[in-house]
Amino acid sequence: MGVTLMKVERPKGTRDFTPEEMRARRWLERYLLDVFRSYGYEEVLTPTFEHAKLFEEKSGEEILEEMYVFKDKKGRKLALRPEMTAPVVRFYNAELKTRPHPLKLAYIVNCFRYEQPQRGRWREFWQAGVEVFGSDRPEADVEVIELTYRIFDGILPSGAFEVRVGHLGILRGLLEEYGIGEDVQNKVAHLVDKGELDEVKTLLPAEPAEKALAVVTARSESEVEEAVSGKERAERALENLMEISDALREAGVDHELDFSVARGLDYYTGMVFEIHVPELGGGSQCAGGGRYDDLVKELGGPDVPAVGMAIGFDRLLLAAELYDRIPDGVEETRALLIPLVRSGKIWEIAAKLRKLGWVVNVEVSGKHIRKALSLADSLEYDYAVIVGERELKEGYVSVKNLKTGVQEEVPLDQLERAAEV
């Protein structure tokens, strides 16, 4: 009986990354983590899967429909994480709530949603973000937006991205004054987030629908003031937004007020913001976040205010590629070590060169020297280090500079001279 060969392809909506792509991804990871650390944020990591109920209460209808949900062998309902805020809050409630506050956390992780794959949208994707626990002051909101702005400003050219800042407390406060419950508020926010404003009229009575639409289509502070006049909670939310906006302008953060920013998650309660890169087209939103003062308590923890944001890692990388902002690579000396003899000394020589800061790739397939040198050229290496029986016996290596063609003998006890060839 013949053997049946099986062709296995990667799942739809996932990707394989080449070495060149991984260099770019690691570059962006290092950049983001350096910025996070410079602001005092400490990196955390949570499990790739959680109990599904963690997301079922507060993540919103759209995410619920897109979650990867399964049961384990004991029948427990689990889900691959579709986003990271809820897991970080769960972790905070379990182990971190006794730490000094405000507590500033950061992460870069993969998430999963069953979406229709397209440019900038995958079923496995990466998020980078921060969360601040323990401050209800506008300074915390300002820092989260300002930090995100600096990240984009440090990578993309001036004018390549837009910062839009809004406040869900205005819409929620307005609807609350009309006796509209949280469930309907969430539905309205989802409709606004998707731009389906006509549907709002079918969901709400005439007057609150008119006022809500006046808020989310407003183009100025005065238009919102008129729409929420006499609605105390909404007025306070507008004041909070203007305080945040004024501080952002003083901090040099170019932004626009956008009262239609609603986000797609049910847990947002106050300030919300998004960053868009218009040149990316339909998938232009690259970051977003906001305040979620009730989520910690709703997930079984203390009454602790919080604010955070998440960056679409893959989309930011796309934007960096679009504007040719990804560095070619770090400056390093790279060599192919070509052994012409079998000896454990080969690994000792390679180790010594690595200690000098070289990247040393040992040729392990036994290629003829001509083919090995051709390989080194194709890899665009700087040097070939040739080790044969005579070299080992006399205590030296032959070092060939692949850029100049110069080849010299370098004593084993003076390998630091190899870079001078």
Curated annotation (Swiss-Prot):
Gene Ontology CC terms, in alphabetical order: cytoplasm
Pfam families listed in its UniProt record: HGTP_anticodon, tRNA-synt_His
Catalysed reaction, written as an equation: tRNA(His) + L-histidine + ATP = L-histidyl-tRNA(His) + AMP + diphosphate + H(+)
Subcellular location(s) of the protein: Cytoplasm
CDD domains associated with the record: HisRS-like_core
Principal location: cytoplasm
Annotated keywords: Aminoacyl-tRNA synthetase, ATP-binding, Cytoplasm, Ligase, Nucleotide-binding, Protein biosynthesis
GO molecular function list: ATP binding; histidine-tRNA ligase activity
GO terms (BP aspect): histidyl-tRNA aminoacylation; L-histidine biosynthetic process
Family stated for the protein in its record: Belongs to the class-II aminoacyl-tRNA synthetase family.
PANTHER family xref list: HISTIDINE--TRNA LIGASE, MITOCHONDRIAL-RELATED, HISTIDYL-TRNA SYNTHETASE
Name this protein carries in UniProt: Histidine--tRNA ligase
Organism the protein comes from: Methanopyrus kandleri (strain AV19 / DSM 6324 / JCM 9639 / NBRC 100938)
